[in-house]
Amino acid sequence: KEGYPMGRDGCKISCVINNSFCKVECQAKWRQSDGYCYFWGLSCYCTNLPEDAQVWDSSTNKCGG
């Protein structure tokens, strides 16, 4: 599984071409994962996630309220 990790506010975690920051963010939540900064979305994106990982989903987006 893969997807956008969420911060405490339910929003995607922002980045600006900083893959190492995103890798740390992903591995803090899911130890075996990897991550990078998705340039077009300016958000961290995680890969190698467990199937039950909770990631940002546009249909259940609670960001900003």
From Swiss-Prot:
GO biological process: defense response
Domain LCN-type CS-alpha/beta span(s) in chain numbering: 1-64
Entry comment describing in which tissues the protein is expressed: Expressed by the venom gland.
Keyword Cytoplasm: no
Identification of the protein by name: Putative beta-neurotoxin RjAa8
Record text about domains: Has the structural arrangement of an alpha-helix connected to antiparallel beta-sheets by disulfide bonds (CS-alpha/beta).
An MF annotation (GO) of this entry: sodium channel inhibitor activity
Family: Belongs to the long (4 C-C) scorpion toxin superfamily. Sodium channel inhibitor family. Beta subfamily.
Pfam families cross-referenced by the UniProt entry: Toxin_3
Record keyword Disulfide bond present: yes
Location(s), subcellular: Secreted
